[in-house]
Amino acid sequence: MRIVLVGPPGAGKGTQAAFLARNLSIPHISTGDLFRANISKQTELGKLAKSYMDKGELVPDEVTIAMAKD
């Protein structure tokens, strides 16, 4: 099962994701957490994501997916 929660900052995505993960026994993957961890560790994917974020652009799906697979 895959569930994607979309919304602006502060909309409650994290709260709802935690609720669903807990009650449906499914993993909770936060792209924001993935970005922050990779940027903090200065991984190649983190540097690439940061280059998009610094320009105010969305991080391409390919980069996000690669982080999730890592």
Swiss-Prot record:
- Positions binding AMP in this chain are T31, R36, E57, L58, V59
What is the protein's name according to its record? Adenylate kinase
Q: Where in the cell is it found?
A: Cytoplasm
Q: Where is this region: NMP?
A: 30-59
> What GO biological process terms does the UniProt entry carry, in alphabetical order?
AMP salvage
- In the Enzyme Commission scheme, what number(s) does this protein have? 2.7.4.3
Would you identify the family this protein belongs to, as annotated?
Answer: Belongs to the adenylate kinase family.
**Pfam families linked to this entry:** ADK
Instruction: Tell me the domain comment.
Output: Consists of three domains, a large central CORE domain and two small peripheral domains, NMPbind and LID, which undergo movements during catalysis. The LID domain closes over the site of phosphoryl transfer upon ATP binding. Assembling and dissambling the active center during each catalytic cycle provides an effective means to prevent ATP hydrolysis.
The pathway where this protein functions is: Purine metabolism; AMP biosynthesis via salvage pathway; AMP from ADP: step 1/1
**What InterPro entries does the record tag this protein with?**
Adenylat/UMP-CMP_kin, P-loop_NTPase
For this UniProt record, the keywords arranged alphabetically read as follows: ATP-binding, Cytoplasm, Kinase, Nucleotide biosynthesis, Nucleotide-binding, Transferase
Q: How does it assemble?
A: Monomer.
State the species of origin: Streptomyces scabiei
Which is a Gene Ontology cellular component entry for this protein?
cytoplasm
